[in-house]
Swiss-Prot record:
Gene: ndvA
Domain comment quoted from the record: In NdvA the ATP-binding domain (NBD) and the transmembrane domain (TMD) are fused.
Entry-linked CDD domains: ABC_6TM_NdvA_beta-glucan_exporter_like
Free-text function comment from the UniProt entry: Involved in beta-(1-->2)glucan export. Transmembrane domains (TMD) form a pore in the inner membrane and the ATP-binding domain (NBD) is responsible for energy generation.
Coiled coil: none
Keywords: ATP-binding, Cell inner membrane, Cell membrane, Membrane, Nucleotide-binding, Sugar transport, Translocase, Transmembrane, Transmembrane helix, Transport
Residue stretches spanning the membrane: 22-42, 68-88, 146-166, 167-187, 248-268, 285-305
Reaction catalysis annotation: [(1->2)-beta-D-glucosyl](n)(in) + ATP + H2O = [(1->2)-beta-D-glucosyl](n)(out) + ADP + phosphate + H(+)
Family named by the database record: Belongs to the ABC transporter superfamily. Beta-(1-->2)glucan exporter (TC 3.A.1.108.1) family.
Protein name: Beta-(1-->2)glucan export ATP-binding/permease protein NdvA
Assembly and binders: Homodimer.
Transport as UniProt keyword: yes
Length: 609
């Protein structure tokens, strides 16, 4: 993305504030004209005081300094009032729009597919959001407060200086050419360097976020020093990349100061020579010295603007790259909100592939009646999770149709569809907020009594009531202040509050101990009542009561039936069940033997001699 296109997009993000932006641009143009008038009036007053009549001021002649001083005061008052107004409105515009863009960015990334989030570190997305919106704010604020006025000053000053005295104006044009050449050189030399700097910033943010998100692991494996050393290594690479960029821009600063002195000396030298020939006045020499000082200040502001755009460019590019990421699924223009559905689910010859090479599911067809429990079993990667992900449109199938109550789910709004589907994940997902706030994710307007009832049905009320703050107890980051079973029961209570007609249980008890699993299963039995339920399970003992079991392998359903029917068929499911139950029976026998046989002793594993 070119620098011009990049900055055009920055201005496009002004959105509804664009009208105010145009007003500020017009005010800056007036400011530029008013600021130009001051050195002109100053020079003419010098001429009057030195005995020369002030001719040529917009076609007006004067032999007295007082009218000129009055005009100068009027221009000065206008400049002050207009400048204050521009500054205030520019501040408010940039702050308002920063918050609007930040909110829009957040909404956008929350709608991106899970596959995008799986491949993108959350720390990077946070860094891009905060640094990108801060960069936009700085550019908007600088542009409307200073930089646009500086550019307009150049547009006004250079042509009018030619009109007043073209010989002295040539020196001002030469100064502009030198500045332009120097700035272009530095920008070209440092563009790739600055991109490398921002890449190291992203690495730094991702590494720090990764370590902070795994503090328990770091401390458990005594990795604090190693992680700090790793962070220092990234910081060192960042500084090594940053130093050459800073050196080049330091050269610009030095050359700017040198240009100030050289230009003023050149104007005085040329002015004296022209004055001796009667080709300019003392007032014009003073005027052009003021022009030179003003020009250098404005050029410095323009260079600062170019520098800021250049320095922010990698951050803005990252920001726009995320904004340009397209959600995998979107609402169709004519999508409808279905209201509450009955829960009849039909997969009709559905196929989907993540990489267009190996199918994740292939020619999948089945029907689930309202209130029916369907279990999905099979090895990891067989297509179980993909099938239910297609149901709530995490992705859309490449072929085939999924219908609920006879309607193609792609004809439904995403919010309307997902409002009818509840998910209880294997790893309970909780916010770093109170228990009440986490429960209200399922039903934002839930009353306290509704939350108590849902918690009771989910076997969660006992541990909530034991807490000092009860429903106001903080769950901690990702729910870490609670045990695994407590987190899972809260997620079940949340699903009960949502009260969806369709429920997905994604291995909801696979990581729990036997006692906790019994409590959670009791809660699951409650939440499954009257709902079309899809259960993904590796523990086959948990799906004995399923109305139907679909056995997946390589993205296809290879067997279907009840628990008893599949065992009797002696197929893939029967072999899997036999292996699991034999393992469990062997484990139980070993435990029983260890309790009754005193000769059996458990000893630590010894490595070596």
């Amino acid at each position: 993305m070119s620098m011009v296109r990049l900055y055009t997009r920055v201005l496009e993000l002004l959105g509804a504030e664009a009208r105010l932006g145009w007003i500020l641009a017009g005010a800056n143009l007036l400011l530029a004209g008013a600021q130009f008038a001051e050195p002109v009036l100053f020079g003419r007053i010098i001429d009057v005081l030195s005995g020369n009549p002030a001719s040529g001021l917009f076609g007006m002649a004067s032999t007295s300094p007082w009218p000129l001083l009055a005009v100068w005061a009027a221009f000065g008052l206008f400049t002050i009032l207009c400048g204050v107004t521009v500054a205030l409105q520019a501040d408010r515009l940039s702050h308002r729009q920063r918050q609007a863009v930040l909110t829009g960015y957040f909404e956008h990334i929350m709608q991106l597919p899970l596959a995008y989030h799986a491949g993108t570190h959350s720390g990077r997305l946070m860094k891009v959001m905060l640094q990108g919106t801060d960069a936009l704010w700085r550019l908007w604020l600088g542009f409307f407060r200073e930089h646009f006025a500086a550019m307009m000053s150049l547009v006004v000053l250079l042509p009018l200086s030619l009109y007043i005295n073209w010989r002295l104006a040539i020196l001002l044009f030469a100064l502009c050419i030198v500045f332009t050449m120097l700035t272009t050189l530095v920008v070209r030399r440092t563009f790739d360097m600055q991109n490398e700097v921002e890449a190291h910033f992203s690495d730094l943010s991702a590494r720090a976020s990764d370590a902070l998100g795994n503090v328990a692991l770091v401390q458990s494996f005594v990795r604090v020093d190693a992680e700090v050393q790793g962070l220092r290594f990234v910081v060192d690479k960042l500084l090594s990349a940053q130093m050459p960029v800073l050196s080049w821009w330091a050269v610009v600063t030095v050359m700017t100061r040198a240009s100030t002195t050289i230009t003023i000396l050149a104007i005085f030298t040329a002015g004296i020579a022209l004055n001796q020939r009667g080709m300019t006045s003392i007032g014009e020499i003073v005027m052009f010295v003021s022009f030179a000082t003003m020009l250098i200040q404005r050029l410095e502001q323009v260079v600062s603007f170019i520098n800021s755009v250049f320095m922010e460019a990698p951050r803005l590019k990252e920001f726009f790259d995320v904004l340009d990421a397209v959600p995998a699924v979107r609402d169709r223009p004519d999508a409808v909100d279905p209201g509450r559905l009955q829960g009849r689910v039909e997969f009709n010859d559905v196929s989907f592939s993540y990489d267009s090479k190996r199918p994740a599911v292939a020619n999948l067809s089945f029907v689930a009646s309202p209130g029916e429990t369907i279990a999905l079993v099979g090895p990891t990667g067989a297509g179980k999770s993909t099938a239910v992900a297609l149901l709530h449109r995490a992705f859309d199938p490449q072929s085939g149709i999924i219908r609920i109550d006879g309607m193609d789910i792609r004809d439904l709004t995403l919010s309307g569809l997902r409002r009818n589907i509840g998910v209880v994940f294997q790893e309970p997902l909780l916010f770093n907020r109170s228990i009440a706030e986490n429960l209200r994710v399922g039903k934002p307007d839930a009353t306290d009594e509704e939350m108590r009832l849902a918690a009771g049905r989910a076997q969660a009320l006992d541990f909530i009531e034991r807490g000092e703050k009860k429903f106001d107890t903080h769950a901690g980051e990702r729910g870490r202040m609670l045990s695994g079973g407590e987190r899972q029961r809260l997620s079940i209570a949340r699903a009960l509050l949502k009260d969806p007609p369709i429920l997905i249980l994604d291995e909801a008890t696979s990581a729990l101990d036997a006692v906790t699993e019994a409590k959670v299963n009791a809660a699951l039995d409650e939440v499954m009542k009257g709902r079309t339920t899809f259960v993904i399970a590796h523990r086959l003992s948990t799906i004995r009561n399923a109305a139907r079991i679909l056995v997946f392998a390589d993205g296809r359903v290879i067997e279907s039936g009840t628990f008893g029917e599949l065992l009797a068929n002696g197929g893939h499911f029967a072999q899997l069940a036999k292996a699991q139950f034999m393992t469990q029976e062997s484990t139980q026998a070993d435990l029983s033997s260890s309790r009754t046989n005193p000769a059996v002793e458990i000893r630590p594993l010894s490595l070596g001699n």
